[in-house]
Amino acid sequence: MRFKQPSRRDRPVMFKRSKNVSVDVGVDSISDLPDAVLQHIFSYIPTELAIRTSVLSKRWRHVWSETPHLSFEWLKVSPKLINKTLASYTASKIKSFHLCTRYSYEADTHHVNSSIEFAMSHNVDDLSLAFRRCSPFYNFDDCFYTNSSLKRVELRYVDLMPRCMVSWTSLKNLSLTDCTMSDESFLEILSGCPILESLSLKFCMSLKYLNLSKSLRLTRLEIERISYIRAPMLSMQIVAPYIHYLRLRDSEAHCTFVDVSSLTEANVDVSTFHPRTCYHDFDPLDPHDLLVMVQTMLKTFQKVEKLTLGVNLLQMLSLSKIPSLPLPMLKVKTLTLETMIIRSVVPGIARLLQNLPGLKKITVYTTNPCNTEVEPCVNSYLDAQDLNPDQWWRLDDVVFPISSEYEVLKPEIMASFMELLLANTRTLETLVVELGSCVARSRFKELFQIALTLSHDKKVSIMLKRSNG
């Protein structure tokens, strides 16, 4: 198959103003725009700024009051002023309402309640409430849980404890970040969202059992969890028989999938390891436990056709005792690797590819070094136990750098990585490599020629991409 060099169409285009073009600064062409266009422009800026623009033109003075998109940041605007602003609002329908505040229980509860009630009474479609970290968290009135117009809700730093029946009959998208709720309370919320399609849970650490078996239309699930330094990590069981797409960033792989039988696309990595590996208040994490976790997780992905794995999970696959824990054969056709090109991911990638007999396409996104890699955390544990790290890692290929040496890669190292991918696949048709900045621009042509030869010899279409930086 042919290997094509990136076209000029992928390069940034620069425009220069002609010396012969004059600009008449005295013409107010914006004021001639229809109200709907001006309101659309206002929807991209905070409401406070939109109001201030009224001094620029009498024509604009009342345009903001009918814009369907309202956005308030209480870091700069007082609660009293926001409610005064809302009193001047004249439109009957709000499409989106965003409110961010450093919530104070004593001083702000009344104003927050008034603002939310205002949005709800105007049949808001998209509601976003971000309460900066505070104690206690904001707790909603009962009326919040009954609304037929809401289609999307995004909440941060709130307590969700409905004392009434939840009825969000139009809600399709629910996103919760740093929210506190019990398993029972969240189940009540889900029961009131009959057409929910997408659910995002970030750092909602109080949830232990996520039962989505009655959410028949829920097809997208995103979960992000983190283990706090001075608290042990709690596991979460997930029952989600109808989801098609999963994005998971889990701390130490503590999510257990009871049922994800409809899953066809997964994007998975392990986020952090520090509390149990770098602090001694808890029992240290045995590397063998990591192997069991990743094996158990992959077993639940046997119907997945599109799979994305991150650098930490790939390093977990590279631990030397993995042969004693056989990996399942997967039906993945499209594989994406988000990784650094380092020695500690190479064995894991090779082993993974050998268990993907129907693989057609690989996409590699090269990433920058991070502070939560498995290799240094596991080594820290092994050193504390007077164990030899070499007995745990299968790092035979010294061609690739270790993480502490990771900088700009030589073309021959990147070529060796591509050869590794091709050598461990039999049905591959396409290889895409997003280089980012890991290969110097001055040596891109050299790598291009190497890839051209590989493409011809292996009968695989290879595409190289790099950032404009």
Curated annotation (Swiss-Prot):
LRR repeat residues: 30-58, 178-203, 204-214, 223-250, 296-321, 341-366
Domain F-box: 27-77
Keyword set includes Nucleus: no
One family name in Pfam for this protein: F-box
Domain of life: Eukaryota
InterPro entries in UniProt: F-box-like_dom_sf (IPR036047), F-box_AtFBL13-like (IPR053781), F-box_dom (IPR001810), F-box_plant (IPR044997), LRR_At1g61320_AtMIF1 (IPR055357), LRR_dom_sf (IPR032675)
Cleavable signal peptide: none
Keywords of this entry: Leucine-rich repeat, Repeat
Protein name: Putative F-box/LRR-repeat protein At5g02930
Native source organism of the sequence: Arabidopsis thaliana (Mouse-ear cress)
